[in-house]
């Protein structure tokens, strides 16, 4: 793939645009902070999902589809989840209530991101499946003098790391001088943060050398990125709001545990989003979830297709703030209406589109080039495949897969049979159907109808 352009990415760590050089061209590794599954994702959460999906597509284009590993985590242990579970299911044991909340929210997130045209990440680890890895990192930090026990908690000792604060450009003296609240008496320094805390009897918890407890927020991502991508990997992404304290503390934990100079070589952050000129908040009445935008008339008195939301996001450079509005959605919809339907065939993306995206994901220029290509394709059908390949690189033209109606009907019948087996709790036979379909290139996605709570299953030809 040597003819592809040189990727240039803005690195928050160095505050400059750099030539991207992967550690291993055979396995380019990307980690993005995913959702905390206590509530449906809002349209601000849609932005990193879309932005880093474009990066994932671009990396696959440059290095090959089988040479990129994209990990996006699911945070399914958090005090916000506990609070939501108690609120929504007061009559149930807390662990059962938590399971209902996290399953419903995670399923909806997958449905939302699929509707937005996002490819499925290579791995989507859950925090609760990686507790052992978190405990192992904490043990290393204690052994190396970077963490301590106090008042039922294990805390990271920020003063033990000489260059703590590199990502956010904050130093410990500034944090101490700027503290507005009294420092917890058990902390050595104001910036020290929780790695592990004890759980009450009714709270979720796991056995550890420090007692039955649960992890702090930051340690979760250090454990999952390390497990699936290694001690040092290529790119770490997320929203600007995560730079401090979350990403700063991830770096501190990972570097001090593994003895490395960096955690990730490049740190990328997407800008903030506001709605109709105001910060999005429930108190302002302009808080909108992805589900509400796609399925209800909450914004603009109508529903909006996922492709329209995606294009509306990409019409602004990812590092710039977005003012999300009905006007912007209408503009994106008008633009999409002018683009022809087309099959990719064996075509490659247009060089102008590819070069724009290689320049720090310049989707603004890429979309301008794509629109010019669409106009040319409307006049000359021979250009259609190149337009389609270029649009697919932005996730704006899903690949069409021709399938005989009889074959599709047969797949539908097997999916329905599996649902009946699941209802009968015959999980072994249900899994056989799922695995057979997967071997045939058919990916199943289980979910629940938000309105009825009934189990639903959709399928697609695996990309």
From Swiss-Prot:
It catalyses: tRNA(Cys) + L-cysteine + ATP = L-cysteinyl-tRNA(Cys) + AMP + diphosphate. One of its GO terms (molecular function) is ATP binding. SUPFAM superfamilies: Anticodon-binding domain of a subclass of class I aminoacyl-tRNA synthetases, Nucleotidylyl transferase. One of its GO terms (cellular component) is cytosol. Gene3D superfamilies: HUPs (3.40.50.620). Keywords: Aminoacyl-tRNA synthetase, ATP-binding, Cytoplasm, Ligase, Metal-binding, Nucleotide-binding, Protein biosynthesis, Zinc. It is found in: Cytoplasm. A motif ('HIGH' region) lies at residues 35-45. ATP binds at residue 282. Pfam families: tRNA-synt_1e (PF01406). A motif ('KMSKS' region) lies at residues 279-283. HAMAP family: Cys_tRNA_synth (MF_00041). This is Cysteine--tRNA ligase. The lineage of its organism: Bacteria, Pseudomonadati, Pseudomonadota, Alphaproteobacteria, Hyphomicrobiales.
């Amino acid at each position: 793939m040597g003819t592809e352009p040189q990727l240039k990415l803005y690195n928050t760590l160095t505050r400059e645009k750099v030539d991207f050089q992967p550690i291993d061209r055979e396995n380019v590794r990307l980690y993005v902070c995913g959702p905390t599954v206590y509530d449906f994702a809002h349209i601000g959460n849609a932005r990193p999902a879309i932005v880093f999906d474009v990066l994932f597509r671009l990396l696959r284009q440059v290095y090959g589809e089988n040479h990129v590993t994209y990990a996006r985590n699911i945070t399914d242990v958090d005090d916000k989840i506990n609070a939501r579970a108690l609120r929504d299911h007061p009559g149930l044991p807390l662990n059962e209530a938590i399971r209902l909340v996290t399953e419903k929210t995670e399923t909806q997130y997958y449905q939302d991101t699929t509707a937005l045209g996002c490819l499925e990440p290579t791995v989507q680890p859950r925090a609760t499946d990686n507790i052992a890895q978190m405990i192992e990192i904490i043990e290393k930090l204690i052994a190396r003098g970077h963490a301590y026990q106090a008042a039922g908690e294990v805390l990271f000792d920020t003063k033990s790391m000489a260059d703590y604060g590199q990502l956010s450009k904050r130093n410990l003296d500034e944090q101490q001088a700027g503290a507005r609240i009294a420092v917890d008496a058990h902390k050595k320094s104001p910036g020290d943060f929780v790695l592990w805390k004890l759980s009450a009897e009714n709270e979720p918890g796991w056995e550890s050398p420090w007692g039955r407890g649960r992890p702090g927020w930051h340690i979760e991502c250090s454990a999952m990125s390390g497990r699936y991508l290694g001690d040092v990997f290529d790119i770490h992404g997320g929203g600007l709001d995560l730079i401090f304290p979350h990403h700063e503390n991830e770096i501190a934990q990972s570097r001090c545990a593994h003895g490395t100079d960096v955690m990730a070589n490049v740190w990328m952050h997407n800008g903030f989003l506001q709605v109709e000129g105001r910060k999005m908040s429930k108190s302002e009445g302009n808080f909108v979830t992805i589900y509400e935008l796609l399925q209800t008339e909450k914004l603009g008195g109508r529903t909006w297709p996922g492709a329209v939301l995606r294009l509306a996001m990409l019409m602004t450079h990812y590092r710039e703030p977005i003012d999300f509005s009905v006007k912007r959605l209408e503009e994106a919809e008008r633009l999409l209406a002018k683009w022809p339907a087309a099959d990719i065939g064996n075509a490659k993306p247009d060089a102008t589109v590819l070069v724009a995206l290689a320049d720090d994901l310049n989707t603004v220029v890429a979309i301008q080039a794509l629109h010019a290509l669409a106009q040319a394709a409307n006049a000359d059908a021979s250009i259609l495949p190149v337009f389609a390949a270029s649009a697919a690189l932005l996730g704006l033209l899903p690949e069409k897969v021709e399938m005989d109606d009889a074959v599709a009907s047969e797949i539908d019948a097997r999916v329905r049979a599996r649902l009946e087996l699941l209802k009968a709790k015959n999980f072994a036979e249900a899994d056989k159907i799922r695995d057979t379909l997967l071997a045939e290139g058919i990916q199943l996605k289980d979910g629940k109808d938000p309105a009825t709570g009934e189990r639903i299953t959709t399928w697609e030809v695996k990309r």
